[in-house]
Swiss-Prot record:
This is 6,7-dimethyl-8-ribityllumazine synthase. InterPro entries: LS, LS/RS, LS/RS_sf. GO terms for molecular function: 6,7-dimethyl-8-ribityllumazine synthase activity. Its EC number is 2.5.1.78. Disulfide bonds: none annotated. It catalyses: (2S)-2-hydroxy-3-oxobutyl phosphate + 5-amino-6-(D-ribitylamino)uracil = 6,7-dimethyl-8-(1-D-ribityl)lumazine + phosphate + 2 H2O + H(+). (2S)-2-hydroxy-3-oxobutyl phosphate binds at residues 85-86, 127. 5-amino-6-(D-ribitylamino)uracil binds at residues 22, 56-58, 80-82, 113. PANTHER family: 6,7-DIMETHYL-8-RIBITYLLUMAZINE SYNTHASE, 6,7-DIMETHYL-8-RIBITYLLUMAZINE SYNTHASE DMRL SYNTHASE LUMAZINE SYNTHASE. Keywords: Riboflavin biosynthesis, Transferase. SUPFAM superfamilies: Lumazine synthase (SSF52121). The active site is at residue 88. Belongs to the DMRL synthase family.
Amino acid sequence: MNIFEGNLVSEGLKFGIVVGRFNEFIGGKLLEGAIDGLKRHGVKEEDIDIAWVPGAFEIPLIAKKMAKSPKYDGVICLGAVIKGSTSHYDYVCSEVSKGIASVSLESGKPVIFGVLTTNTIEQAIERAGTKAGNKGYESAVSAIEMANLLNTIG
């Protein structure tokens, strides 16, 4: 029996990060967490590229462009969609999650869903570096682990 697991050694790995600018205060905190997570695990600053997009809905397209590039071992998608009084929230959340999953499956690379989908701004703030941790950091660690797991499996 073979058991495969990814590790958190990231020397030589390169990552793209796509961040939605809408709710930029939250996206910026998630980005800080992701960069911190990558650097703490050995990714060099020059091996991190960041693309800002207008909002969460635009994330999958740029994630796809990065994932198709041989330059990147993985892509981290960050942003925040906060529920409002209309059904727009439901459509955006659904399409962003489907789009990111599709990019990962099509590219064969880890494309990590680090987009917060919350009912309130307070919930988003909690998940962007306060009492619920930083989902950007967690997404970066997931990207490292998945990139290594894919490399291990071959």
